[in-house]
Amino acid sequence: MATFIPQECLRAAPWKNGGGSTMEIAISPPGAGLMEFDWRISLATITASGPFSSFPGIDRSLMLVDGDSVQLTLDGTRKVTLSAAQPMLWFPGEAAVLAQVKGTTTDFNVMTRRDRCRHQLEKITAPGKLARRSAATLLFIAGEGHVLARGGEQQFALARHDALLLDADDAQEWRLDALQRSAVLCVDLFT
């Protein structure tokens, strides 16, 4: 059964280093902690430059959803700037990552435990169609405007930063309708 996750139900947890906060969107298994999850999807708001936490054995994807840019230095050598031109990055969770920001940014964050599952993150556009590729799929509205997601007998009205978690019992084909073009982040989770 599809689970609608409205933005107003997300709660921010401040980082220990004081450089930002995280709002967990979904986690599996439900109620798992940072050491037990198979996968975790969240929004991270970065307010100050500093290091990321290390997550050994975890594969991560980040996509910039708000703010101008964030410059990431991985393992002291590889520099990547997340911006509108290059909004997404995949990296291993054990990498030493240093973030440099000039203003507040918000990143969509997907983490999967490497020995249990994997993920694929892509940006799609509504209006359009979605053919699911996995038993668990999460849709996140990153753009402005509203999106009506319809699959089988179900339909959900989604606004900016709302999410919809689809499981194996939900339709494989979905229609995403919108009055204006809107960016939708689609996460396929493979277990």
Where is each model-derived feature located?
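Jelly-roll (double-stranded beta-helix
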Residues: 1-191
